Each structure stands twice: as structure tokens, then as C-alpha cells.
Amino acid sequence: MATGAPIRMTTAPRPMTMTMTMTATMTMTTDVLTLSQLLSPSFPVGAFAYSHGLETAISEGRILSAPTLQSWLMDLLEHGGGRSDAVLLNAAFGAADDLVQPLDAHARAFAASAERLRETDLQGAAFCETVETVWGIALGRLCYPVAVGRAAAILALDPELTSAMYLQSFIANLTAAAMRLVPLGQLEGQKTQIALKQHCAAIAKQLQGATLDDLHNSAWMSDITSMRHETQYSRIFRT
């Protein structure tokens, strides 16, 4: 008995699968849009006024070019303020209500200098005030990464995406400061951010579910420049 060519059976995607895929895509898109607003330079936390000690590092000749800036920022992401902020953000995201204030106190105690404490406190206070006014979410007064993590949890945002975009915002703000101080051109600034993009994503992924046990810092030169900035004679940034 002759047999013809095999009959290819095709099945349309199940309606439930399509619905779930569309819902997940829409949720992720909404998360991106919400985080783009929360972490935008236009969000009134005054991020433009803080250099995280970068101003002193530049004035002392430690950062003179795009490559030296990129190296400095990489250290912050892997060993310094960027990483520790991401740890605190994720710890706040997963914290029970009664543990948020102790976590915030720990974050404040972890600040390496008076200016670092001021930087995280004032940005956090402004963030909390704006979130309460716009979204009706009362966060109290929390330092910046704790406030962002807490708001993201309440708004049911994706924690890994929140961490990655927070780190990208952190890098973008310091790059903008360096563009004014070194100075660097706008194209060099954009290339620096692109070079660090994958590191932001990788660190965000690595720190999912992080707790205070994961908190550490070994970017000591950044901490020292932050301390020196307090007595720097001529400066345009608050930290």
C-alpha cells in the first residue's frame, strides 16, 4: 500500500498560553515604564547634586579620561556603593513590614562617610515624599536604596529589573557628573554607559534574594574621596 508524504500536524497556540504570554509581556512593559519614571533624572530626588566622591577623585587626578572613569565605576558596581545599594534594595524588597526600619538603620550605619549618609538620606526622603504624593504609598523616611526596594515591592515590580535599572541610573548619574568635571564629551559618556550595561544586568541577577549577609564593601578609595570631599575647598556637588 503506497504511502504519501507525512502529514504535518500544526496546532494553533492554546488560548490560555497566548493569554498568559500577552499578560506577562504587558506586565514587563508596565514595569519598565514605571521604573523609567521612578529612576528618571526628572524624578525629584536631586540626584544631579551628588557625585558619590567622584568630584574629589577627579580633582586629585585619579579620573582623567573615559577609560579611567569606566574603571572607577566598575569598581563601584562590583565592590562599592553600586553593589551595596543593590543588596539593600533587594533586602528591602523581600523584607517583612516590621523589618524595614531595622534594615534602614543598618543601611545608614553602613554609610562610609557623613556625606554618603547625607546622599542616601536626602535622596531617599525626596523619593518617599514623591511616591506618597503620586502613588499614595506611605513609606515613611527611608534611605534611597531601601525606599526604592520597598516601593518596587508594593508596586509588584520585577525585582531583577528594578535592580538592573537602579544600577543603570546610578552609573548614568555619575557619568553625567564626570562629563562636567573631567570633562568628557557626550559620546564618551554614552560609550561608558554602554560598556557597563551588561555588568549592571549581571550584578542585578546575581543579587536576587540578597540579604544583609551579602552586604560588604571594598571600594576604599571611593570611600576615602567621599571623606575628603567634605573639606574640599572648591566644589560644585554636595557629595
Show where each model-derived region lies.
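Metal- and O2-centered redox machinery and metal/ROS homeostasis
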Residues: A2-T239
